[in-house]
């Protein structure tokens, strides 16, 4: 049966900050499929938001032009390094469902692991690359998986991973949390919400950093006609 792609993004700001340094965007690929871009700018507040929006805009523009994900990551890094002279960093993720190659590709310059859930198993894949912007020859880490029904991928920024640290708790083991809820049959949106709610709870309802969770799932469908749906909810201060 054909596949259906579900993407859910849940995010919130650092406590008492009106602007989030995290930016997440979804873009349709010219060859078919979707890409999700997540940028976590250094720091928080207006400066971090300006940085993350600038980098995500550049990435989205290149993806729409058909540039390959790895080249996009390098170009965004080169731009940041050239203009900020290695003094400003950002975490940068692209996760794509590429219909040309029938694969899911994660291209990452990040500090947090990626959670992969397939065939009933949940695995936490540590990143092998650091953030962009600091060193001239920084390269992304690339993970490629077959695009098949039942695959679920969870990405999150470092605010999720460190949730609870300032309250004296250990870091948030997202992989273990996913294992604990995997029998509940959660949708992408429900899983993203559950992870975000748990991170906020661990921070005593006062997030110590910007928090972003992205969940991408692949499932089978028998829809006719094919209807694409997209919705966004943004509560205003």
Q: Language-model segments: what does each one mean?
A:
Residues 49-119, 126, 138-140, 192-216:
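Catalytic core of PPM/PP2C metal-dependent serine/threonine phosphatase domains
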Residues 22-79, 167-171:
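Primarily the active-site beta-strand->alpha-helix module of PP2C/PPM metal-dependent phosphatases
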Residues 17-34, 90-92, 125-170:
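Acidic loop->beta-strand submotif enriched in PP2C/PPM serine/threonine phosphatases
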Residues 44-65, 152-203, 222, 228-231, ...:
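Active-site-proximal, acidic helix/loop segment immediately C-terminal to a metal-coordinating Asp/Glu
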Residues 1-20:
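Regulatory cytosolic signal-relay segments
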Residues 123-125, 143-145, 226-237:
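Generic detection of short hydrophobic beta-strand segments and adjacent strand-loop junctions
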Residues 40-41, 111, 156-160, 210:
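DG-centered beta-turn motif at the end of beta-strands
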Residues 122-123, 129-130, 134, 174-177, ...:
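Small-residue (GG/TT-enriched) beta-loop-alpha framework at ligand/catalytic clefts
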